[in-house]
UniProtKB/Swiss-Prot annotation:
One of the primary rRNA binding proteins, it binds directly to 16S rRNA where it nucleates assembly of the head domain of the 30S subunit. Is located at the subunit interface close to the decoding center, probably blocks exit of the E-site tRNA. One of its GO terms (biological process) is translation. Disulfide bonds: none annotated. Pfam families: Ribosomal_S7. It comes from the Bacteria. It comes from Rhodopseudomonas palustris (strain ATCC BAA-98 / CGA009). The lineage of its organism: Bacteria, Pseudomonadati, Pseudomonadota, Alphaproteobacteria, Hyphomicrobiales. Belongs to the universal ribosomal protein uS7 family. One of its GO terms (molecular function) is rRNA binding. Signal peptide: none annotated. Part of the 30S ribosomal subunit. Contacts proteins S9 and S11. Keywords: Ribonucleoprotein, Ribosomal protein, RNA-binding, rRNA-binding, tRNA-binding. InterPro entries: Ribosomal_uS7, Ribosomal_uS7_bac/org-type, Ribosomal_uS7_CS, Ribosomal_uS7_dom, Ribosomal_uS7_dom_sf. This is Small ribosomal subunit protein uS7.
């Protein structure tokens, strides 16, 4: 990491279909090897499947899923006198969003459906109903933080 200055944050433009910045960030995380059009078709295809299955606006389901996956607290390692403690700390809002997006996509990639579009739509539907691997990941992180609550006074 550079000590001189932090890299300036780049502006993320809203996606063309919904005009939402979070959808663009999600799309960029789905993207492999700079293939944005492929990522776009996967995400929009998943949204179309969600709309067909639930008869609800897909953006609402997506936002609900992301809310259910974003962690509020996590543990970070802190070395104190030869021992390493897992110290629970609150998660900043930007990191919450990034972790939520990352966990949703990782969980979707690990599913058994045939295409990525189907996997993503199924994981988003599960997450919006508080089920699925992404929600389980959030619960595991919260459990770790709760188990190490005794070390919260080592917070920095």
């Amino acid at each position: 990491m550079s000590r001189r200055h932090a890299a300036e944050k780049r502006e993320v433009l809203p996606d063309p279909k919904f005009g939402n910045i979070i959808v663009t960030k999600f799309m960029n995380s789905v993207m492999y090897a700079g293939k944005k059009s492929v990522a776009e078709s996967i995400v929009y295809g998943a949204f179309d499947l969600i709309e067909a299955k639930t008869k609800q606006p897909p953006l609402g389901v997506f936002e609900q899923a992301l809310d259910n996956v974003m962690p509020t607290i996590e543990v970070r390692s802190r070395r104190v006198g030869g021992a390493t403690y897992q110290v629970p700390v609150e998660v900043r809002s930007t990191r919450r969003q990034a972790l939520g997006i990352r966990w949703l996509i990782t969980a979707a990639r690990g599913r058994n459906e045939k295409t990525m579009t189907e996997r993503l739509s199924a994981e988003l539907l599960d997450a919006s109903n508080n089920r699925g691997n992404a929600v389980k990941k959030r619960e595991d992180v919260h459990k770790m933080a709760e188990a190490n609550r005794a070390f919260s006074h080592y917070r920095w």
